[in-house]
A protein has these predicted regions:
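Charge-rich cytosolic interhelical loops and cytosolic tails of multi-pass membrane proteins
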Residues: 73-152
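N-terminal first transmembrane alpha-helix
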Residues: 1-101, 197-199, 215
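Single-pass alpha-helical transmembrane signal-anchor segments
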Residues: 201-210
Length: 238
């Protein structure tokens, strides 16, 4: 759990503050032209960036829960629903889902859930008449599966991969908002170069989009690994 907290929550929060730190460095360094003449451009930029980077890194570190909440609100819930009925873990166990596991795998998991926790997944026939109940039953079962596989070392990396992407996107919401405000200030002529900020903003959006595109696939990889850890206690290799 300590590794998850570090790699899936702290690191993405800190990394999401990198571009705002660079833009802030550009603005402040433009005010210190005399410093650049004395130290040289590269050295002065480093001298300005280091303390700024530390400050923004600290902001990301302490705001990581806010970033996590934002990632759920803006990305996870729209994709998978707040009640988790559209999560990859649910889709893989639904008979009617195109992305479902093999019939044999679903039956194996269903049997084990009934034996371990008394949770009975709906049959293929019953699912057709009550899809919502089938989804909610799966969600209940998945919650139990997560509890018993929490310390599985092979599953941890898949969990970190998904958590990193999701939580980075939460930080990207705040950093993008910050860059939009800075761009507005630049255009007003108060401080900084609006072209530099615009480039940084576009790069931030493209980077966040690239991470967002991988979020669903990371979710399915984690879901398959979760079920494999539950029924076989081995690394996902389907």
């Amino acid at each position: 759990m300590k590794n998850y907290e570090t790699y899936a929550r702290k690191y993405p929060a800190i990394i999401s503050m990198l571009i705002p730190a660079i833009v802030t460095t550009q603005i402040l360094s433009s005010w210190f032209s005399q410093l650049q003449e004395c130290w040289g451009t590269a050295l002065s930029l480093i001298g300005v960036f280091v303390p700024i980077g530390v400050v923004y890194g600290a902001i990301g570190y302490f705001a990581r829960q806010l970033f996590r909440d934002a990632s759920k609100m803006f990305f996870q819930f729209p994709l998978f629903k707040e009640d988790e009925t559209e999560m990859p873990t649910t889709k893989l166990l639904l008979w009617s889902s195109e992305k479902r596991l093999s019939a044999n795998a679903i039956k194996t998991i269903a049997t084990k859930l009934k034996e371990d926790f008394g949770i009975k997944l709906l049959s293929e026939t019953k699912e057709q008449s009550n899809l919502l109940e089938a989804k909610k039953t799966i969600v209940d079962g998945v919650g139990k599966i997560r509890e018993v596989t929490r310390n599985n070392p092979n599953l941890l990396q898949y969990n970190i991969d998904f958590g990193f992407c999701r939580n980075y996107l939460g930080g990207a919401v705040y950093s993008t908002s910050f860059l939009l405000i800075v761009l507005f200030v630049n255009i007003l002529g108060v401080a900084g170069d609006w072209k530099f900020t615009l480039i940084a903003l576009v790069f931030q959006i493209l980077l966040a989009f690239a991470v967002f595109v991988t979020l669903k696939s990371k979710g399915y990889s984690y879901a398959r690994a979760l079920f494999n850890a539950y029924i076989g206690n081995t690394e996902y290799n389907w």
